[in-house]
């Protein structure tokens, strides 16, 4: 209900919204959660496992219960926290994890079955009959699991990634954060002030405090106005710092479009920031924890500090008759504020015997809440008084405060561990856990406003001095300095179910059961019970759960330890992390210099990594790609063909130790390679498996040009960087990728030399440019590189020119080729040509094959060392038991061979234990007039001439094949060298 005269909302601006199909009204400045409470909507959702009724618990990002699905036109955003969603006119939200309705949820039957669904039930309950797991149990569990549902529609909203640099990043804009920002801003530092809420001020907006004689909210307004006037201060509201990383890098999620339905064109819904800073101050405050008692999860039971936030910031009371239960002095502030606002406070239950009231309300000292009543919302509580008597109190809202936990999460993101502070009964940040990050205010365990202001100023001054700024501290504002008093109290005890993790339905009993079943480690307990594995990551429950675990194991909380803190601090949309990573342009589209002309000729383009390459070049009268492919293959075999091979990786290598570097990378020697010659090379990973193959030309005494496959160009470049920096930093060598510097074209076929001699400034011959040779040439006065290498098995060359001349050269080559009866050929024909010749691609060197497997073991030099050499000789990586490269020809009635199909002995049953290999590549060869294939077959080189059965289980195709050598065309190589 609304409370007159309270809150920072604008009651003159009425906003309409819907929840669960019902229409409601709120005010500007409301959150969705506060507006729902103002409309007496206490039932907001259902829990994950038992589907128990759930209401709002907190007022921040740690909210475990009030998760809703927001709808914006066709867009749907599940698992949105109502506590963090500013209200806007037309907002549409609906509850989730309930069917058919929120009030009547069929799966609430799980709560009746709770004895069978206790901790670790999935390891024990559904074990029999065994085959039911796959067909019955697992599908049923997966169907029931989850909270919100993703939309299956394409997300048309814009997301961005961005980078920012600053002197100091201040995380959180409460009293410590604002004071730190003012101090750093006045000192002239470049400041970023990030806060996850839409309004700055932190807890100051939720308290009835005064700073320097003015209301805290007014002081916040003045501080923010001053900060906004600094050119060196950037204020980022609605921005959650999600992770701390090496070298002063922080991740942050800015929810740009959080408070509007439709964004202006070009404005992103969310932006994920990478912030680089010289220093950071964590002022993220503290999170209130619960006390476990029977049925403490009913709607209407919430954090006492959150109740205070809804009253003082939003002008909302979650009930008409309010009770408070706590173990610390801060809980009394809630009772005081509600009483002063005219809301009936029926009880302040304090577990401490010596507690003193702060106002006019009934106080029960040395008492505890033992249970609650109500089906879909709280109706009453039972308390046990200090004399042992039990009393029932009617109320519709209960605020619970088990103390405050400093927000240590970011300080632990680099494997640091927090430090237990017995005075606070909480974990506090470990100093120096994150280099350059310090904590101030409640995040550092300083719970008073005066202390938070002082720490924020002190840490900012220290950082300013470290960065060379001379600054005099300004007068510190005067604020409340009341010390924080607490007597630890975690669990009331009793026979009823007392809840710790509200979202995942983890109870005190579950923790104790995990201990009984010997899951005593905190990490084991976490995974066995799912404690702290919900979307709030245990922010509300982990410390209380650790206390229960410590008690059950007879240890202290410090000895029990904490689970590992990992980023992100709050859930981050994958669309924000991968901004720009969806749709066709998720990565750079790399186009050939011949792209325009290829498309003009009707060539369908296919993706080859990030490149677009022509698949084939159709001609008039051709109705199927095979017709074009067969024609192009025969064209290359009989006349001449032109193919753009610019996509091959090209790495320029120079330096006195270039040859030694290549010898270390490749299995074979390149120090012995003569200038003007090209050599085929094989590169291994450190585990002995083939990484890549390609050619390397020696352009000068200390100058080489390496080519890689299109698929592995980036991988090879990264590998070379690693080898040079990590393994051989002693070598004086430099290398750089020049893939896009050069346009390179294969000229293949019997007429290849004739074509080139028609365009080169000086003619070539077999003597001046033999097979596997290189020559610097000119055509029309333009310097070019000519390599005599072949991937087709034909007399062939590769001609490279600076990329700016690529399109013109392609046009020239194409015209000359067509005049000789040839033309362009695409990727399909290139694949057929290489299979006919027995050449391999990454279909064969797919990461699981060795030099021995592909028949190139002799290329591993005995005279030198190289990466992977020793590992490649391990038992199991050589020998007849290995799958070895072979060729296949169909010899039965069925002529179909399918890549990926498995090979079996002709009479063997086609099951896994009889598997003898698999097909990697196949094509129809117009040269041979039949289907041919490459495959890996166990001991294949000794089985040429034998028969093998190919079985493709998905399509049900079985083909009898003859095993042969992988080289089908011109095995002597006469056409290459002619």
At which residue positions do the language-model features occur?
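Residues forming anionic-ligand binding surfaces in small-molecule and nucleic-acid pockets
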Residues: 286, 519, 630-646, 690-703, ...
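Short beta-strand segments
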Residues: 22-24, 273-275, 391-393, 692, ...
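Conserved, structured C-terminal
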Residues: 595, 599-600, 613, 700-703, ...
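A short, contiguous, amphipathic alpha-helix enriched in charged residues
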Residues: 34-44, 656-673, 754, 758-762
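Residues forming the flavin
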Residues: 1-589, 741
């Amino acid at each position: 209900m609304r409370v007159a005269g309270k809150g920072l909302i604008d009651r003159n601006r009425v906003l309409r919204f819907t929840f669960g199909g019902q229409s409601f009204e709120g005010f500007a400045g409301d959150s969705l959660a506060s507006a729902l409470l103002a409309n007496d909507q206490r039932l907001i959702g259902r829990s994950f496992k038992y589907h128990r009724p759930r209401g709002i618990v907190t007022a921040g990002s740690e909210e475990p219960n009030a998760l809703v699905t927001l709808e914006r036109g066709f867009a749907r955003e599940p698992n949105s926290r109502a506590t963090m969603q500013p209200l806007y006119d037309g907002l549409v939200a609906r509850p989730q994890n309930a069917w058919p309705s929120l009030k009547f949820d069929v799966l609430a039957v799980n709560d009746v079955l709770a004895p069978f669904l206790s901790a670790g039930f999935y390891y024990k309950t559904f074990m029999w009959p065994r085959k039911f797991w796959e067909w019955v149990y697992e599908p049923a569990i997966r169907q029931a699991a989850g909270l919100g549902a993703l939309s299956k529609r394409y997300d048309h909203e814009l997301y961005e990634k961005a980078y920012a640099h600053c002197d100091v990043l201040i995380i959180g804009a409460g009293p410590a954060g604002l004071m730190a920002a003012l101090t750093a801003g006045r000192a002239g530092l470049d400041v970023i002030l990030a806060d996850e809420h839409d309004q700055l001020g932190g807890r100051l907006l939720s308290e009835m405090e005064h700073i320097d004689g003015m209301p805290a909210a007014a002081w916040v307004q003045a501080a923010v106005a001053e900060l906004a006037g600094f050119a060196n201060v950037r204020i980022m509201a609605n921005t959650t710092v999600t992770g701390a990383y090496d070298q002063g890098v922080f991740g942050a999620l800015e929810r740009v479009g959080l408070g509007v339905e439709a964004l202006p064109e070009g404005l992103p819904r969310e932006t994920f920031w990478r912030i680089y800073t010289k220093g950071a101050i964590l002022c993220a405050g503290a999170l209130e924890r619960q006390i476990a008692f029977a049925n403490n999860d009913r709607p209407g039971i919430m954090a006492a500090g959150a109740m205070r936030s809804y009253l003082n910031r939003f002008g909302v009371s979650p009930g008409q008759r309010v009770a408070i239960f706590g173990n610390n002095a801060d809980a009394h502030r809630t009772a005081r504020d509600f009483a002063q606002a005219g809301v009936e406070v029926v009880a302040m239950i304090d577990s401490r015997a010596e507690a003193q009231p702060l106002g006019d309300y009934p106080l029960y000292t040395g008492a505890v809440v033992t249970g609650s009543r109500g089906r879909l919302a709280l109706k009453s509580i039972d308390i046990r008084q200090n004399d042992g008597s039990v009393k029932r109190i009617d109320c519709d809202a209960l605020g619970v405060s088990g103390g405050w936990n400093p927000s240590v999460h970011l300080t632990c993101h680099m494997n640091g561990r927090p430090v237990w502070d017995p005075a606070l009964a909480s974990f506090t940040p470990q100093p120096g856990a994150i280099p350059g990050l310090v904590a101030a205010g409640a995040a550092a365990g300083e719970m008073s406003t005066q202390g938070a202001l002082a720490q924020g100023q002190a840490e900012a001054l220290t950082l300013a001095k470290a960065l060379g700024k001379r600054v005099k501290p300004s007068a510190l504002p005067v604020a409340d300095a009341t010390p924080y008093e607490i007597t630890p109290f975690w669990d009331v005890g009793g026979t009823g179910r007392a809840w710790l993790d509200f979202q995942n339905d983890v109870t005190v009993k579950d923790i104790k059961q995990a201990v009984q079943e010997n899951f005593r480690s905190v990490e084991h307990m976490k995974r066995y019970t799912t404690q702290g594995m919900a979307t709030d990551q245990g922010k509300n429950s982990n410390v209380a759960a650790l206390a229960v675990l410590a008690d059950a194991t007879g240890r202290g909380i410090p000895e029990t330890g904490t689970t590992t803190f990992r980023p992100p601090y709050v859930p981050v949309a994958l669309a924000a992390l991968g901004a720009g990573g969806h749709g066709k342009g998720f990565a750079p589209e790399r186009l050939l210099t011949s792209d325009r002309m290829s498309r003009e000729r009707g060539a369908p383009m296919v993706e080859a990594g990030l490149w677009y390459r022509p698949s084939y070049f159709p001609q008039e009268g051709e109705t199927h790609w095979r017709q074009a492919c067969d024609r192009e293959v025969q064209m290359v075999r009989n006349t001449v063909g032109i193919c753009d091979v610019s996509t091959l990786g090209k790495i320029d290598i120079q330096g006195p130790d270039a040859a030694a570097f290549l010898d270390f990378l490749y299995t074979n020697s390149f120090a012995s390679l003569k200038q003007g010659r090209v050599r085929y090379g094989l590169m291994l990973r450190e585990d002995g498996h083939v990484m890549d193959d390609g050619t390397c030309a020696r352009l000068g005494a200390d100058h080489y040009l390496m080519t890689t496959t299109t698929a592995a160009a980036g991988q090879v470049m990264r590998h070379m960087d690693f080898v040079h920096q990590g393994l051989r930093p002693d070598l004086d060598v430099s290398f750089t990728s020049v893939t896009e510097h050069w346009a390179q074209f294969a000229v293949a076929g019997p007429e290849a030399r004739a074509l080139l001699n028609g365009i080169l400034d000086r003619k070539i011959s077999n003597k001046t440019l033999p097979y596997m040779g290189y020559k610097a040439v000119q055509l029309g006065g333009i310097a070019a590189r000519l390599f005599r290498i072949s991937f087709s098995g034909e007399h062939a060359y590769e001609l490279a020119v600076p990329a700016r001349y690529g399109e013109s050269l392609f046009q020239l080559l194409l015209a000359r080729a067509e005049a000789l009866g040839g033309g362009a050929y695409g990727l399909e024909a290139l694949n057929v040509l290489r299979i006919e010749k027995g050449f391999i691609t990454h279909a064969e060197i797919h990461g699981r094959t060795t030099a021995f497997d592909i028949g190139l073991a002799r290329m591993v030099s005995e005279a030198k060392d190289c990466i992977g050499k020793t590992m490649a000789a391990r038992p199991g990586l050589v020998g007849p038991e290995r799958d070895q490269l072979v060729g296949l020809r169909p010899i039965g009635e069925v002529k179909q061979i399918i890549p990926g199909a498995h090979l079996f002995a002709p009479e063997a049953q086609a099951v896994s234990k009889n598997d003898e290999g698999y097909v990697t590549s196949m094509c129809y060869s117009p040269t041979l007039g039949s289907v041919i294939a490459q495959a890996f077959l166990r001991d294949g080189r000794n089985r040429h001439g034998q028969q093998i059965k190919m079985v493709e289980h998905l399509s049900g195709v079985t083909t009898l094949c003859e095993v042969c050598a992988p080289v089908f065309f011109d095995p002597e190589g006469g056409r290459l060298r002619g």
